[in-house]
């Protein structure tokens, strides 16, 4: 694992004396930024107050789902490494490094000699760390720790935005401060000695570094920015000019004028295995972590993120970053657990072009969160399908009611399917059903038998016309006869205002057939329908009464014409016309009167009146009296003034004509008048030629 192929072309010699770098302008600039006075380097061991332990061997080939613990963050002591400065071959540019060691104890400061010695050892190993061997593999699954190296340019960064050295100093100090998080136990176990660090070389590592999924905790954010620097020829040899990265290239290249906010975060692999409950892992990734990334320049697309060695649940999170339009520029492996602590050994991250970032720009940087709905999106699809199925079934149930018959075999009227004239289908939960097409003869025979007893059994409960709704809306108290129930409702407590009321459900008013109590149907009340029916009956009676009166008047006019113009076909005897008049008189008052018959004897002129009294309504008496009075008026005065005693002698057949017996009712007086009129008519016989030649 420790064998590494060193490339002499990529290594930078370390035999250059320190005095040469101390006189350089970059050294002077960095010394002005640092609050620590320069002293000579003394090799001392870097100490950590946290719990250190030897990492166990890598037994597992794939990481386990582990719980994510929040660790303590430490305030970094800003120091400048003045002992190691890299100069290009042509001497055109010099580049310096600001190495940020992390010490847990905030009250103690590491001496300058410790920092310089650590920087010397780290800088000498840079070519080995930056060069990844594509032949080795198998160890890309170990978690890594993150360290920050900020590269400073040889000149003060005043060319782009004109900021002074004091502004840069304040910006660097603000960016190198890592805010403290929640103090939770177990954070010290992530920090070990520098000798325990292992550099793994595999193509997966370079692929992971090429694709960055930058996730940090919502309560623990830090902001890092790079300052403008010049290119180094020996480093840029491995990087193509177009800014793309190869498979074996561990670092991604930032495009021009693109911010490097929170992107300079490298890492070395540490053999730390954490065996804890896997339940909290998903929750921490979804709830606690947020992605702070920069948007790509228009026209550029984010590279596909291939993170090696993560489980299926983390793959869902990694792939969801692409769907949420989060730009991916740098990459590092997030297998194992996401680190929240740092080690003293650092790995510099090189970029082709970097942009100066001030604290104000860092504060205005947008923060994007990973949506929770993107984790396991396939689970929502199944639930949506189930809901759609339920809604479809509910819609079918509402549109058509189905029966639940047990013993009637669906051949009774209370079976909704049978009463509606349809066959039972699948939604019905009936038992031993005969209401099916295979038993059509039985169904038809049963229907015919029920209709023979009740013809309206299968008739619709409500008969509605197009005008019924309009009529009901005009007057709520009136119910159109065309929209009334055939059977009627039987509501007791609902006042005909519920859906189970057949009248209310059909949109019609209650009728006389309804047996409801306290009806308040908005389409028509039961008492209102009674009034309408009574009014309609009165109107019918009035029309019938007028028609009958008109018919009586017409008969009176006809009788007048007969009297004024007697026909020549009548016999010479004066009695037949009057007898004809007397015979037709009962028909003049033929308005539902009990028949009062006048019998004319063959040999005698006697009249017989039945003993039964005549029951006549008051409305029917008046026209009869009017007719009789009019008839007496049209008689000649001679007949009115003639004596009654002569009737006996001059009767046609020499028979006595007995006057009618007076009755107690008014009809008796009417008949008496008729008898008097008849006597007067008989008295006028001498005016005609006598039938008896002897007289």
Curated annotation (Swiss-Prot):
Polar residues bias (residue ranges): 1-18, 602-618
Cellular compartment(s): Nucleus
GO cellular component term, pick one: nucleus
Motif (Nuclear localization signal): 269-283
Sequence ranges assigned to domain CRC in this UniProt record: 399-524
Keyword Nucleus attached: yes
Effect of residue 501 to Y: Abnormalities in floral meristems and sepals including increased cell size, decreased cell number, disorganized layer structure, increased DNA content per cell, and partially formed cell walls
InterPro entries tied to this protein: CRC, Tesmin/TSO1-like_CXC, TSO1-like
Gene deletion effect: Despite a wild-type flower phenotype, the null mutant presents defects in pollen, carpel and ovule development, including a failure in megasporogenesis. Small siliques.
One Pfam entry name: TCR
Tissue specificity of this protein: Ubiquitous but expressed mostly in flowers with highest levels in developing ovules and microspores.
GO biological process, one term: guard mother cell cytokinesis
Start and end residues of each stretch annotated as Disordered: 1-21, 107-127, 559-578, 599-626, 650-676
The keyword Lipid metabolism appears for this protein: no
Sorted UniProt keywords: Developmental protein, Metal-binding, Nucleus, Zinc
Role noted for this protein: Probable floral-specific cell division component, required for proper organ formation in flowers. Regulates the floral meristem cell division and the inflorescence meristem organization. Plays a role in development of both male and female reproductive tissues.
Family of this protein: Belongs to the lin-54 family.
Domain note: The cysteine-rich domain CRC binds zinc in vitro.
Protein name as annotated: CRC domain-containing protein TSO1
Organism of derivation: Arabidopsis thaliana
This protein's encoding gene: TSO1
